[in-house]
């Protein structure tokens, strides 16, 4: 397949390594999969929630931080959905290698970034927006003037990708499954072009 021509520092592309199918892999047998993929409604929710939060930050309305508030931004793009990013994210989500990032997810167009989220409940499957909010909440630990560092990256890296100004497109894959009686929702979002370059500001201060 065409993805076998895309190499990332010698590592095979996810779609080359695991194949073109988005069906759950045999690794998923340890859980009970109930749905694969995002619905049209969920796609809209994902894009709208990212843009709502990006605009909130860009307008200087995010009061949280370490220290807060976050400065306003002058260069924040509005994100649009990208089906190819979503497809590659879904191939990876369907491997059930939970909480691990894949090694090569780029497209011919983009270097691609990634966020992963998980939530579970006994009552109902956690909604897709609640998973994105987990990423946004990392803003509480972010110091804009310090930026992304090796030390803080694990605490703030999802937030910084969500609001990385130069990112233009997002596409996500998801699986819902039951494990030990818990209704679990696992979300992988891919971003193009990627954010989270150390030493670069996440956006230009207004």
UniProtKB/Swiss-Prot annotation:
UniProt-annotated location(s): Secreted
Ranges that cross the membrane: none
Residue ranges occupied by any SCP domain in the UniProt entry: 48-191
Tissue: Expressed by the venom gland.
Domain of life: Eukaryota
Family annotation (InterPro entries): Allrgn_V5/Tpx1_CS (IPR018244), CAP_dom (IPR014044), CAP_sf (IPR035940), CRISP-related (IPR001283), V5_allergen-like (IPR002413)
Family annotation (CDD domains): CAP_euk
Gene3D superfamilies the record matches: CAP (3.40.33.10)
Keywords per UniProt: Allergen, Disulfide bond, Secreted
One CC-aspect GO term: extracellular region
Disulfide bonds listed in the record: 4-16, 8-104, 28-96, 172-189
Family, similarity comment: Belongs to the CRISP family. Venom allergen 5-like subfamily.
Protein name according to UniProt: Venom allergen 5 2
Organism: Polybia paulista
């Amino acid at each position: 397949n065409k993805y076998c021509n895309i190499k990332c520092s010698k590592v095979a592309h996810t779609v080359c390594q695991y194949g073109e199918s988005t069906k759950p892999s045999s690794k998923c047998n340890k859980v009970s999969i109930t749905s694969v993929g995002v619905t049209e409604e969920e796609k809209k929710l994902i894009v709208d929630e990212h843009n709502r939060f990006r605009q909130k930050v860009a307008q200087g309305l995010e009061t949280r931080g370490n220290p807060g508030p976050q400065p306003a931004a002058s260069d924040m793009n509005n994100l649009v959905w990208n089906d190819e990013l979503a497809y590659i994210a879904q191939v990876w989500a369907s491997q059930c290698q939970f909480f691990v990032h894949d090694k090569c997810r780029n497209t011919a167009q983009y270097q691609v970034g990634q966020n992963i989220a998980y939530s579970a409940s006994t009552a109902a499957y956690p909604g897709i927006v609640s998973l994105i909010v987990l990423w946004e909440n990392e803003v509480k630990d972010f110091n804009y003037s310090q930026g992304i560092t090796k030390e803080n990256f694990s605490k703030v890296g999802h937030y910084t990708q969500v609001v990385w100004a130069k990112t233009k497109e997002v596409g996500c894959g998801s699986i819902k499954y039951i494990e030990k009686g818990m209704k679990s929702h696992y979300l992988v979002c891919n971003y193009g072009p990627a954010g989270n370059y150390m030493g670069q500001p996440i956006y230009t201060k207004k």
